[in-house]
Amino acid sequence: MLISQTPFWSGWFRAPKMETALIPDFDRKIEGICRECTREKITAFAGVPSWNLVLMRRVLEYTGKSNLLEVWPDLEFFAHGGVAFTPYRKSFAKLIPSEGMTYLETYNASEGFFALADDLTRDDMLLMLDYGTYYEFRSGEQIVPLEGVRVGEVYAMIVTSINGLWRYEIGDTVEFTSTNPYRCLLYTSPSPR
């Protein structure tokens, strides 16, 4: 888990405590987070949308509040990744009824960090080209290098480590919206097309 590798000083700016975040039992972890964090000034969340929905709904049950702004009035930012956010957008808007809430989508996986929303007025993400990953894409049976992708086409993503020791089709599909710079929309398999 990445959280166990963070520097000691990050604990000054985050909640819950490291011990709580690392509880292996999911239900005990959720309860611990509710006990600790409902008394904190929380301004941001980060993580996988599905997991955060479970947590946020439990926080509302725990506190008896109707939305998260009643618990954390300064909540303004959610950085999310791991899955496409579109299916979760309405649920989050209901839990956090704020026009000022900022959602930052990232495309990360166990294999690496691939893209992020660098322009919050757009739905697509900027592909990270200098993070130690070699990209290829599969369209049917054809393998396409990054420089060969076409806007509007849906591809299965293949990543290779920079040292070439492993190559892996990660199971997600992307649609390129631009090739200068490379921007894409993320779909969880199968693609919507």
Tell me what each language-model feature is.
Residues 2-189, 193:
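Active-site glycine/GP-rich loop and adjacent strand/helix microenvironment
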